[in-house]
């Protein structure tokens, strides 16, 4: 919400929320997945009494993004200086391969990226690595502004390592990145769209990703919302049983709609507009659900389904000079 709808939130509430999350940081650097209403810091996805293994592989990156977005909106670099050490510890907690990509040991599967936190991806991971690169670039910029050249160089190098090595997940035949290198070695629609949206240096790969999204529009979009995998695929492994076609195993989500629309706008603006019109029409008629499918809807009034596309559409309008 802070990234895409900061103007809709009280500034002090955002600041206090960040400090509350960081207050729950463990000694090993792990930051909470969430805080309960009673103040309990919860580190793993799933119910408190039945966690889905170790903490997800994106908590550290989102913590950095949260602080960076707050500083960007407020200009409060002193706030960054005050919490910078905690952010470094959080990033150091993340498990990474020799090539710098975020990884999950196949012998110890657990939640990866939050919007696939029930999916048993293992090995080197696409989405969490994209987030790590993005967070590292943000930290490099913030440390440079704060006058810490050594830290800026460190995180710039971490981002550069991912930029050089993410190609190990590239499927040349499909022209798309795979979600993971071991388990769930499948085309990741969200991850590829986000790579474009996040400005990852793709070179010639970008044209192929955009082409895949356009050609497979009917397999990945329904009522303006986006599947994690091309229809009719489901994930090879899950951490808990999930019926194919539902939730994170084949339902369609508004969370990623803005990323896909942004990506398509570069070469197929009419197709991007079609997606956005379908999304808005569906929200007006039925409401904004967490995810949907034919004869299936889950969790109405899901805030991310609204604010993620909002942020992406604002950015698209600004970058492509749309009214």
Residue map of PLM features:
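Aromatic-rich carbohydrate-recognition surfaces in CAZymes
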Residues: 1-101, 126-129, 254-264, 272, ...
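Glycine-rich, flexible loop/turn motifs
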Residues: 27, 31, 111, 115, ...
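Catalytic cores of carbohydrate-active enzymes
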Residues: 32, 103-105, 121-125, 131-231, ...
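A short local loop/turn or secondary-structure capping micro-motif enriched for an aromatic residue
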Residues: 41-42, 112-113, 282
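Short, flexible helix-coil linker/hinge segments at the edges of structured domains or between repeats
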Residues: 100-119
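A glycine-rich, aromatic-flanked flexible loop/lid motif
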Residues: 222-240, 249-251
